[in-house]
């Protein structure tokens, strides 16, 4: 429908790895929590290999990566709700705030330092009903100290390798 109104606007066919049609943007959701594994999933883009192809080889109907701009539209999802057993996030929850910050900054840096990643979006900004993986609480109050928030800001505002 978008193309009917503006044929110049790039479109994502299906968000999150499952591209079934001709696409203009290769959109990926990736909730890997191990920073080095995460970094490795994007280490061979110059050879035409993107993480979803490495981990989802059995899905033959999914369109392969063909050189389109790569947008990691969902990553992170790190659970932080130390006072609650309710809710969830991806992977094992960090045991300390410092571990959360290291993981957040590491995952973010892995994308920003990759010259083939054109964009990324941390999921998610706020906690929602069942998901306790936001940077802020459900009521929009900060979960983290100003010092930790500054670490997040610096990680997100680093110059991206694709800008060079």
Q: What are the functions of these language-model segments?
A:
Residues 1-142, 151:
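Substrate-binding/catalytic cleft of secreted carbohydrate-active enzymes
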Residues 153-164:
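Surface beta-strand/loop "capping" patches
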